[in-house]
Amino acid sequence: MALTRFERFLGRLLRAVVWILFAAFKLFAPQQRHGVSRLPPITNPLLLLSAMQLARKIRRKEVTSVEVVQAYIDRIQEVNPLINAMVKDRFSAALQEAAQVDKLIEEETGGEDVLEDRLPLLGVPITVKEAFALQGMPNSTGLLTRRDLVSGADAPSVALLKRAGAIPLGVTNCSELCMWLESHNHLYGITNNPYDFERIVGGSSGGEGSILGAGSSVIGIGSDIGGSIRIPCFFNGIFGHKPSVGIVNNEGQYPPASGQQMGFLCTGPMCRYAEDLIPMLSIMGGPNAEKLSLFTEVDLKKLRFFSVPHNGGSHLVSPVEPQLLHAQKMVVKRLEADLGVKVQELLIPQLKYSFQIWGTMMASPGKDGKPPTTFAELMSEGGKKVWPAWELFKWFLGFSSHTLAAIGLALVELFQSSHPSPFIMQQKESLQQELEELLGTDGVLLYPSHPLIAQKHHHPIFTPFNFSYTGIFNILGLPVTQCPLGLSAEGLPLGVQIVAGKLQDRLSLATALYLEKAFGGWREPGKTTIKP
């Protein structure tokens, strides 16, 4: 469906307003300065192994857990001053736990197979998004009024990974209250992209994306209600998976979902190597993971593949960058050449309304009729009530405790209608039905992860609706795997979303494994020259 003349005019007008506002914003926004333009290269070969490879070596006594954990601690201490990804560590406790693992392995009489079955991640280090409860660690989500809060227990997903033998190294940064695609807050500061320190890492799981992309962690935990796993994975060149809704327990993270949001929020794995996705999801899902048949072999040659290059031209969203369109076309060519399949290119008109659909559904009341907690109410947690307009005035004077993105979201909510548009609801239902019928149990769809390659810090303020490329799949409840596709001409990560039908997670995960081999997967940023 082509854009109308009026819609094209609105698009040009919006872009003009955005750049005028951006010029004004630069006068007020804090400026960053870095004396170093790139990460130091990885020198310890243990940091270049997947979690599954590390677990195997630890079980076989080819390397100790202490050696692996210490290698990651050394790397974090080397690069974290540059990227500001980890906000609180537990290095001493992690080394003690690693020593206990090594002792357990020495004393185990049942053999390697027993350990693999019982403790598949035994001795492997992991990092955790600060929004999740990790015993003894902060759980503030960047809110100053929660700065002294320490978790007394683990979130269920964290507990399952620890029970499988994983050793947490610490917690990582996120956007204020987990509702923005730049990981920045006034408690911990801003997190930098490992490929270019002047670029964003995405959000809200941006600290995880950055620390993984920097080679300072091998596996991590993120959450996703609008792209908060997939966007950071895209910007930082790593893998991530938003599972089918209802598979992984979402409890133990802040802020809690309300209204209908629990049906859109997903907890999932983030990692540098695709082979770690299925084992992590199997562990994190607990008994629910059985619904996914994750270990059933997938024959990619028998799947139906589709490619959607853009959302149809919404005037609210940036056009997809040519390098991203080209990367997706290269995936299509490779699939057709290697697998002998025919990838069908589609345009789906309803995707044009992705942001409106996401916004409408996120604001919808729950089954009990209660509306979701407003963002301003969440910002007021543990302190005085936040008045968005007054907070904006304070921000311009430099006195606000909140980020501009958080204040802006609270302001937008003031003008949000409590009555959903019948037209938007019709588009949502139509899109849901069309995609579910299209994908079925053997379909895979390629879709841009984001219309833009990682932007400079603070720039997303002026393209706030671009996240709708990921957010729409939260509303639809479909599983999506984020897959890296090499680097752009500027040395920044490229990527694509791989979408499958409900409970068909294994199809998108199998496709990601194939694309990792075809396109090289994660690229070490320390070996990438950054343009000034």
Swiss-Prot record:
Cellular compartment(s): Membrane
UniProt-listed Pfam families: Amidase
Membrane topology: Single-pass membrane protein
EC annotation from Swiss-Prot or TrEMBL: 3.5.1.99
Regions crossing the membrane: 9-29
Primary localisation category: membrane
Database matches in InterPro entries: Amidase_CS (IPR020556), Amidase_dom (IPR023631), AS_sf (IPR036928), FAAH2 (IPR052739)
GO cellular component: membrane
Keywords from the UniProt entry: Hydrolase, Lipid degradation, Lipid metabolism, Membrane, Transmembrane, Transmembrane helix
Gene Ontology MF terms in the entry: fatty acid amide hydrolase activity
Active site: K129, S204, S228
Catalytic activity, reaction form: N-(5Z,8Z,11Z,14Z-eicosatetraenoyl)-ethanolamine + H2O = ethanolamine + (5Z,8Z,11Z,14Z)-eicosatetraenoate; (9Z)-octadecenamide + H2O = (9Z)-octadecenoate + NH4(+)
Gene Ontology terms: biological process: lipid catabolic process
Family per record: Belongs to the amidase family.
Protein name per the record: Fatty-acid amide hydrolase 2-A
Lineage start: Eukaryota, Metazoa, Chordata, Craniata, Vertebrata
Gene of this entry: faah2a
